[in-house]
Regions:
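Bacterial Sec-dependent N-terminal signal peptides
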Residues: 1-24
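Extracytoplasmic/secretory-pathway proteins
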Residues: 22-380
Length: 380
């Protein structure tokens, strides 16, 4: 019995030692990156990647590649091209959720490449695409291939990445974010609030802006403005037309799906984050269809959403600030009488929203940001 206890203690000590060493190794990469020792950090990442491959550890492989790419960006001139290749190579060896996240990271790398070499994409518009893009072709595409891709081809690649990522939908919904927060490129607020990896992937699908490209979307926006700009419940009730050719409709469908998924979430911060993302996207859309009717619906929608958070002061303050920001006055020396009167009305509205923020959430970041907004607006 004594021998068994000794053996068990030795085994536990060995496991803890190995675990601590692993934690230390990841911390070492982070420290090297923070100190600007990018080459050393990259080499450490490659070392951990080889170790993870030997063990068949899917998550460690993804983590090593991701951290290695961060390090490479600090000193490699063609780090974007290398990132595309790294994720293409690692995806087939990953499993489940790790593979989903890798697909979203590949889509980010492809976006970076497209944006960096936009002039090539413009020249490639006349390039004839010989065959539809598939996952196999996407993972096998060389950098030479990418130089000949049109903007439409990159959009197809992004769509394929997202569809492949969501193939693990059940696993994503059941997995807590935890350590994956560190692996996903996105805004800090979203990473902190998002409760599942399903949201991580969905968040990547929803852009910060949506540009209208066809009459169908513009008509939809106008005819269903109360639902599109309304509360989460109103937005969910909207029947979107099925049109796979419309990129904007596809985006709206994914946004609606995410809203529906969290409709009964008791965490106000999570719901508010999703509503904020939705209204941000809708704000860009109404900006593309610049009519007073749509702008009015947008403002009314924001007001309804703000009221829906009456039991969550901080979240309500966020939407009130959005309203205040929208009502910033713009008066110039040469502005006419009508313009001045209109802008003064906006200024009065802005003050009302800011006053309410101070009343319901005086210690919130929105109260502080509101003070700065007021100073900018009144002392330009």
């Amino acid at each position: 019995m004594k021998k068994l206890l000794t053996l068990a203690l030795l085994l536990c000590t060995t496991l803890l030692s190995a675990q601590n060493k692993s934690i230390t190794e990841w911390q070492e990469i982070d420290t090297l990156i923070a100190q600007g020792h990018y080459t050393s950090a990259y080499e450490k990442g490659e070392e951990l990647l080889r170790k993870a491959k030997r063990k068949g550890d899917s998550h460690a492989m993804l983590k090593a590649v991701y951290k290695g790419r961060i390090a490479a960006a600090g000193y490699q001139e063609e780090h974007i091209e290398a990132s595309v290749k790294a994720y293409q190579d690692i995806i087939p060896t990953l499993q489940g959720v790790d593979k989903s996240i890798a697909y979203t990271l590949l889509s980010v790398a492809l976006d970076d490449y497209k944006n960096r070499y936009q002039w090539r994409n413009e020249q490639a518009k006349l390039t004839k695409e010989l065959s539809p893009l598939t996952i196999t072709a996407l993972l096998g595409a060389t950098i030479d291939d990418l130089t000949m891709w049109s903007a439409e081809r990159f959009a197809d690649a992004k769509r394929l990445c997202y569809e492949a990522a969501l193939a693990e939908e059940k696993a994503l919904k059941a997995t807590k974010a935890g350590d994956y927060d560190l692996l996903v490129k996105g805004d800090t607020l979203g990473l902190r609030l998002r409760p599942t990896l399903y949201d991580v992937v969905m968040h990547a699908i929803i852009p910060s802006n949506i540009y209208l490209s066809n009459a169908k979307i513009k008509n939809l926006l106008y005819d269903h403005r109360n639902q599109l700009y309304g509360t989460a419940e109103e937005f969910i009730s909207l029947q979107l037309p099925s049109d796979t050719l419309s990129y904007e409709l596809w985006q709206l469908g994914k946004l609606q799906e995410l809203t529906r998924y969290h409709a009964k979430n008791t965490d106000a911060a999570v719901r508010a984050h999703i509503d904020h993302r939705r209204m941000k996207a809708m704000g860009y859309m109404q900006g593309c269809s610049d009519t007073e009717v749509l702008q009015g619906a947008y403002i009314e929608g924001l007001e309804r959403i703000a009221e829906s958070y009456s039991n969550a002061p901080t979240e309500q303050a966020m939407f009130l600030f959005k309203l205040a920001d929208y009502h910033q006055p713009t008066i110039y020396e040469h502005s006419g009488k009508e313009t001045v009167e209109r802008e003064l009305e906006k200024a009065a509205k802005m003050e009302q929203y800011l006053k309410r923020i101070r009343q319901i959430a005086p210690q919130s970041e929105w109260a502080k940001t509101g003070e700065a907004l007021y100073k900018r607006a009144t002392h330009p």
